[in-house]
Regions:
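Extracellular/periplasmic juxtamembrane helices and adjacent flexible linkers that interface
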Residues: 7, 35, 266-345
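Ligand-binding cleft/hinge of the Venus flytrap
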Residues: 66-73, 156-213, 217
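Bacterial N-terminal signal peptides that target proteins for export
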Residues: 3-20
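C-terminal motif of bacterial Sec signal peptides marking the signal peptidase cleavage site
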Residues: 28-32
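N-terminal segment of the mature folded domain
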Residues: 38-169, 308
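A bilobed periplasmic-binding-protein/Venus flytrap-type ligand-binding module shared by bacterial periplasmic
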Residues: 137-145, 254-269, 275, 284-288
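Short helix-loop capping/hinge motifs at secondary-structure junctions, enriched
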Residues: 144-151, 169, 182-190, 264-269
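Ligand-binding pocket segment of bilobal, Venus flytrap-like solute-binding proteins
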Residues: 187-252, 258
Length: 345
């Protein structure tokens, strides 16, 4: 496991809320909490304010929270939650949205909160390197795989319509891009050829929703032939009887989602985080289609290990990757999106 900082048709596009609007919403939330003894991070007493990326919402509300409440540490603890595109969620916390536990899709968002002084610098210094759970990027297709999709290369050579979230708002989309890019490098292609492959797939992308959860919704509603997705999202869709199955590409990236308590968070938030890393908490993630960070609990029948599984550290970690690929002004992927007419702000 790697440290997050190592190395961290008609086109329809939906991206996150503008920064100014996020700040206004966050300010309204804080104002609505006036008169309490809450700290600057919004944590108080026995309440845990969760701000997280979109896909694990039901794992928290339906499984993790009730299981924790049944423990001796969780008695009397209350929860509030906000879930959405990872980048939007991080910007909301920066703007003042109450948060005592933050869980993002990729390390760049957590590092930004660390640099803003809202998360302690040692957030990633435990045995799991601050990672809540893992997944891999997969290719979700229609039942029976009518297009015969087996790898990222098929997205380049076949006449297919693709769905992936917008990489300027969605952490999941950034994992998708780096999975595709890395798979090409591992075939021996140059960095330019790998970036050209990313451009080709984005050209075939018919919709770029703001989050991974919204991208899955578009796919299950019948749009597109292939969805670049978290493995857990594909598993969820299959289990719910959607017209979906998925392919684990032979070469793909390990997804690591960082989690931390904010500075000045109540003890209940740390207790909940400790529960998430416990065997019981990790088993809950596994039961919901995520790969546990506790390797002793990994079921390799349910979660096959790809032939060529690589990490974000291979590209310099999320700080470097964010600057090189996803910076709105100078990032290589942002430049491709601008060329394709996709909003980047």
């Amino acid at each position: 496991m790697r440290n997050a900082r190592e190395g961290t048709r008609q086109r329809s596009v939906h991206i996150g809320l503008p920064a100014a609007l996020l700040a206004l919403v966050a300010a309204m939330v804080v104002a609505g909490c006036g008169g309490s003894d809450d700290s600057a991070t919004g944590s108080s007493g026995g309440n845990v304010d969760i701000v997280a990326y979109s896909t694990p919402e039901t794992v928290y509300t339906d499984s993790l929270e009730p299981a924790f409440e049944a423990t001796s540490d969780g008695g009397g603890v209350g929860f509030s939650g906000s879930f959405g595109a990872s980048g939007d969620q991080r910007r909301a916390v920066e703007a003042g949205q109450p948060a005592s536990l933050v869980h993002f899709a990729q390390g760049g968002d957590m590092i930004a909160l660390e640099e803003a002084g809202q998360v302690a610098p040692n957030w990633d210094q435990n045995k799991y390197k601050g990672i809540g759970q893992e997944s891999v990027v997969v290719l979700a297709v229609r039942k029976g795989n009518p297009e015969g999709i087996k790898s990222f290369d098929d997205l380049l050579t076949k006449d297919v319509e693709v769905i992936t979230p917008n990489p300027l708002s969605s952490g999941g989309a950034r994992w998708n891009v780096m999975a595709l890019y890395g798979s090409q490098l591992h075939e021996g292609k140059s960095e330019k050829e790998a970036l050209d492959a990313v451009k080709t797939v984005l050209e075939k992308t018919i919709v770029q929703p703001g989050s991974a959860r919204d991208a899955l919704a578009a796919f299950t509603q019948g749009e597109g032939d292939v969805l670049l997705a978290y493995e857990n999202e594909a598993i969820k869709a299959e289990e719910e009887g959607e017209d979906v199955e998925y392919v684990v590409p032979p070469s793909t990236i390990r997804i690591e989602t960082p989690i931390a308590v904010t500075k000045d968070a109540a003890d209940s938030a740390q207790s909940f985080l400790d529960f998430i890393w416990s065997d019981e908490g990790q088993q809950i993630w596994s039961d919901n289609g995520y790969r546990p960070v506790n390797q002793a609990l990994l079921d390799e029948q349910k979660f096959p290990v790809p032939q060529d599984l690589f990490d974000i550290a291979e590209f310099g970690g999320w700080e470097k990757v964010t600057d090189e690929f996803f910076d709105e002004e100078s990032g290589k992927v942002a430049a491709i999106e601008k060329e394709l007419g996709v909003p980047t702000e």
